[in-house]
Amino acid sequence: MMTQMKTSSDEMKVAIIANGKPQSRRVASKLFNAFRDDPDFYLTKKNPDVLISIGGDGMLLSAFHMYEKELARVRFVGIHTGHLGFYTDYLDSEVDQLIETLRKDSGAKISYPLLNVKLTLADGRSFTSIALNEAAIKRNEKTMAADVCLNDVLFESFRGDGLSVSTPTGSTAYNKSLGGAVLHPTIEALQLTEIASLNNRVYRTLGSPLIVPKHEKITVYPTRMGSYTLSVDNKTYINRNVKKVEFSIDQRKISFVASASHTSFWERVRESFIGDMEE
């Protein structure tokens, strides 16, 4: 979804975050030098208007979680110091183009939905996280057994290695490797994908990815005690005595700087997984 923000004569607050690769540091240095003495920009990591992530998709994921409490304000833009990444609009050779884009910026943004994850333990404690890509729950010993509910109504009793829930943009990540569908981000929905489910005469699950619309909730109730791993993007949590994990579309969204260089979703998919097709 693309929206237009109100323009302002104030200087743009810009934060720059880079991974440790030499090329990323060189790009960051070029941006610092360009912005440092420019009256249109103010370099700060506190309450930025625009966050520039330099590296790859992993770096942008880390930057997203660093600023997840400021999503209403900040817009992201990615520079990939290598080949084109899924969340990046600019290559390291296009720094001057990015600077010019920000100089002419009108505040326009493109927004994508996020995943809300709520973990509740048997003692009543609960913890909430958000994900840009996906979350997955697995049992650390033996097979995971869990009841899966949709809007608090039992849908299936699952047996297998685990379950993954992805956002539309995350549908191209771990979800795709599990055989899930690629979902366009304008479709505000979640995708539930099974991880090595057991299907035989005793245990039966749907065995297919499930698309759940925006206002519905997925709840997973583990039916066996033990240690469970809950991964949320690039973060991992290990807990015992998990009562339930709830997945839903978050009220917040991640926003990217909208420009002529913002690659369309299907073009990103083609470039990431298919590449140029020879005639």
From Swiss-Prot:
EC number: 2.7.1.23
GO molecular function ontology, one term from the record: metal ion binding
Binding site for NAD(+): D57, G58, N133, E134, R159, D161, T172, A173, Y174, N175, K176, S177, A196
Record-level GO cellular component terms: cytoplasm
Record flagged with keyword Glycosyltransferase: no
Keyword Glycoprotein among record annotations: no
One GO BP: NAD metabolic process
Primary location class: cytoplasm
Catalysed reaction, written as an equation: NAD(+) + ATP = ADP + NADP(+) + H(+)
Pfam families: NAD_kinase, NAD_kinase_C
Active site (catalytic residues): D57 (proton acceptor)
Cofactor(s) needed by this chain: a divalent metal cation
Cross-referenced Gene3D superfamilies: Probable inorganic polyphosphate/atp-NAD kinase, domain 1 (3.40.50.10330), Probable inorganic polyphosphate/atp-NAD kinase, domain 2 (2.60.200.30)
Superkingdom, natural source: Bacteria
Keyword terms of this UniProt record: ATP-binding, Cytoplasm, Kinase, NAD, NADP, Nucleotide-binding, Transferase
Location of this chain's protein in the cell: Cytoplasm
HAMAP family: NAD_kinase (MF_00361)
Function: Involved in the regulation of the intracellular balance of NAD and NADP, and is a key enzyme in the biosynthesis of NADP. Catalyzes specifically the phosphorylation on 2'-hydroxyl of the adenosine moiety of NAD to yield NADP.
Family according to the record: Belongs to the NAD kinase family.
Name of protein: NAD kinase
Gene responsible for this protein: nadK
